C-alpha cells in the first residue's frame, strides 16, 4: 500500500534548490510538556509555518499527563514560540497554526486517551484536510516506546488509510548497548515498517554536517587528497562547557561515550570517511556509511588508546563550579564518564593506517564541535629547518558549531627580508558568505519527516553497527578502574594528552 506523494506538477522533482513544501499532514507529539518539545519542536513547527513550508491545514496534537483543554495547549505553544522561535512572530501565521492544535490528556497506558487521539485524528482529517497523514513524535524516554507503539497499533493509529502515510519519529538514546538497541528496533518494527521510522540525530540536521558531503563531492579540490596518501590523522571533537545541569537521573546511567560517541561522533566519522555515494538518496548514503562503520577496527590495547574522565571542581567562565560527584543526585561512588576519547581505525584501502581520534566531554574549555582532517608534512623541504620550525601541519577544519564554517590551515612566508614560514588560515564562515539564515536542525528534520525524505536519519543498521564499536570499550572500562579526574574548564584528563603523545601527535586546541 503506497502512500500518495504530494508533488507540484510544475516543478522538476530533481531541482532541490527551493525548499519543498509539506503536503496535507499533522504531527502528534508524545511528551509534549518536556524541554525538547518546548525549546525545539514547537518553535521549529512555527518557524516552518512562518516560512510557508507547512500546508495551510497543518495540525499539531499534544499528548501528555496534564489536565489541559485545547486552548491551554495552544497557550503553552504560544509561549514557547515567543521565547524560542528563530523567525519573527506574526499573528496571522500563529492564528492559522493555532486553529489546528488539539490536546489529549492521559497516560500512555490509558485506552480512553488513545481513543480520544484516534477521534482527534479523524476530526482533523475532516476539518483540516490532513488526509490521514500523521507523524507520531515520541519525545519520551525509551522505556515508554513499547507501550506507546503498542497503543498506536492497538487503536489503529499506526496503520495508514489507503493512499495516506503514518510515520514514527524517535529520539536518542537508541538503546544503551547492542542487545537493547536490537530489542528496541524489534519493538518499533513490530508496529511500523523500517521505512516508516525516523530516528532523530539532530547533528545530521545541521548545515555544516550536510556541507561535509558538498565539500567533498561537489569539488575537485579536496577529494583527491582525502585519503591515507596525504592525511596523517583525523580529530573529531564535541566539547561542552556546561555540566549535567538537572539531568543527573538520565546522565548518570549513560555517560558521555554512550550519549555522544555512539551517535553524533560516529555519524560524523562515517560522513568524513565514506566513499562517494551513487546518488544523494537515503539508501545510497546508508550503503556508504555502513561500509565505514563495518570497517572500523578497535585498537588491540584498549587501555592505551581509550580514555574516560570525570570533571572535578574548577573554574568555568570566571565562576567556581562543582565537580561531577558533588552534583545533586549523583552518588559519590559513580564511575560514569563525563569525558571520553578513543582511537579508531577504518580498515579499508582509503584509510588504512590513518587513526581517527574521537573525543567528547562536559565542563571543557569551550563549547565547540569540529572535524579536523590533519595532513602529513611535506616529504621534503628545500628550506632550512629554522625557517619552518614554527610551521605546523596543514589541516582542513570543519566547524559544526558555533561559528559554522570551514578553515583551511597552511604555511605562508612571513613578510620580511628573511625566509620564515608560519601557519595561516583561510576562513569560510556561513554567516559572512550567505545572506540566508541557517534553519535550526529540528526545522529541517521535522520537514523531512513530513516529506518522507530519510537522507538525514540514521537507519537501524547504523545504530546497531555503532553499538558494536562502542560495546567492547564500555565493557573494558567497566572492569578497569575509575574515570580519570580533570578540573572543570580544562580540556580533559592528562591521560588523553598522553594517549596522543604515544602516537607522536597532540590534540588541536579548537
State what each model feature region is.
Residues 1-170, 174-510:
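Secretory/organelle targeting and membrane-embedding segments
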Amino acid at each position: 500500500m503506497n502512500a500518495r506523494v504530494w508533488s507540484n506538477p510544475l516543478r522538476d522533482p530533481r531541482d532541490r534548490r527551493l525548499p519543498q513544501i509539506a503536503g496535507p499532514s499533522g504531527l502528534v507529539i508524545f511528551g509534549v510538556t518536556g524541554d525538547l518539545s518546548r525549546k525545539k519542536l514547537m518553535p521549529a513547527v512555527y518557524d516552518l509555518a512562518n516560512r510557508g513550508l507547512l500546508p495551510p491545514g497543518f495540525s499539531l496534537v499534544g499528548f501528555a499527563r496534564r489536565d489541559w483543554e485545547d486552548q491551554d495547549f495552544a497557550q503553552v505553544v504560544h509561549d514557547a514560540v515567543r521565547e524560542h522561535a528563530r523567525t519573527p512572530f506574526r499573528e496571522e501565521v500563529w492564528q492559522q497554526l493555532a486553529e489546528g492544535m488539539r490536546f489529549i490528556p492521559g497516560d500512555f497506558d490509558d485506552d480512553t486517551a488513545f481513543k480520544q487521539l484516534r477521534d482527534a485524528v479523524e476530526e482533523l482529517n475532516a476539518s483540516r484536510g490532513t488526509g490521514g497523514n500523521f507523524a507520531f513524535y515520541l519525545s519520551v524516554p525509551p522505556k515508554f516506546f513499547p507501550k506507546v507503539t503498542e497503543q498506536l497499533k492497538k487503536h489503529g493509529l499506526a496503520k495508514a488509510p489507503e493512499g495516506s502515510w503514518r510515520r514514527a519519529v524517535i529520539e536518542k538514546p537508541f538503546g544503551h548497548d547492542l542487545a537493547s538497541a536490537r530489542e528496541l528496533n524489534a519493538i518499533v518494527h513490530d508496529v511500523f515498517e523500517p521505512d516508516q521510522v525516523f530516528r532523530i540525530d539532530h547533528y545530521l540536521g545541521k548545515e555544516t554536517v550536510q556541507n561535509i558531503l558538498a565539500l567533498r563531492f561537489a569539488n575537485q579540490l579536496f577529494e583527491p587528497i582525502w585519503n591515507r596518501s596525504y592525511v596523517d590523522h583525523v580529530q573529531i571533537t564535541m566539547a561542552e562547557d556546561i555540566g549535567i545541569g538537572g539531568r543527573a537521573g538520565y546522565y548518570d546511567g549513560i555517560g558521555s561515550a554512550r550519549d555522544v560517541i555512539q551517535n553524533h561522533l560516529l555519524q560524523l566519522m562515517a560522513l568524513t570517511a565514506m566513499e562517494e555515494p551513487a546518488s544523494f538518496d537515503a539508501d545510497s548514503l546508508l550503503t556508504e556509511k555502513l561500509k565505514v562503520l563495518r570497517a572500523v577496527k578497535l585498537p588491540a590495547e584498549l587501555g592505551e588508546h581509550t580514555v574516560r574522565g570525570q570533571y572535578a571542581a574548577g573554574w568555568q567562565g570566571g565562576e567556581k563550579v562543582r565537580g561531577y560527584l558533588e552534583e545533586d543526585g549523583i552518588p559519590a561512588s559513580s564511575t560514569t564518564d563525563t569525558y571520553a576519547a578513543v582511537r579508531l581505525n577504518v580498515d579499508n584501502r582509503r584509510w588504512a593506517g590513518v587513526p581517527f581520534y574521537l573525543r567528547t566531554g562536559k565542563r571543557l574549555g569551550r563549547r565547540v564541535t569540529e572535524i579536523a582532517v590533519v595532513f602529513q608534512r611535506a616529504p621534503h623541504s628545500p628550506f632550512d629547518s629554522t625557517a619552518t620550525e614554527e610551521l605546523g601541519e596543514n589541516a582542513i577544519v570543519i566547524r559544526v558549531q558555533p561559528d559554522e564554517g570551514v578553515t583551511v590551515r597552511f604555511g605562508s612566508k612571513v613578510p620580511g627580508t628573511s625566509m620564515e614560514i608560519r601557519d595561516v588560515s583561510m576562513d569560510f564562515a556561513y554567516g559572512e558568505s550567505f545572506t540566508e539564515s541557517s534553519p535550526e536542525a529540528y526545522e529541517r528534520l521535522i520537514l523531512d519527516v513530513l516529506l518522507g525524505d530519510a537522507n538525514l536519519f540514521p537507519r537501524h543498521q547504523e545504530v546497531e553497527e555503532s553499538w558494536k564499536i562502542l560495546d567492547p570499550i564500555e565493557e573494558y572500562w567497566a572492569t578497569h578502574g575509575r574515570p580519570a579526574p580533570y578540573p572543570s574548564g580544562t580540556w580533559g584528563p592528562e591521560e588523553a594528552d598522553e594517549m596522543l603523545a604515544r602516537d607522536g601527535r597532540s590534540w588541536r586546541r579548537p
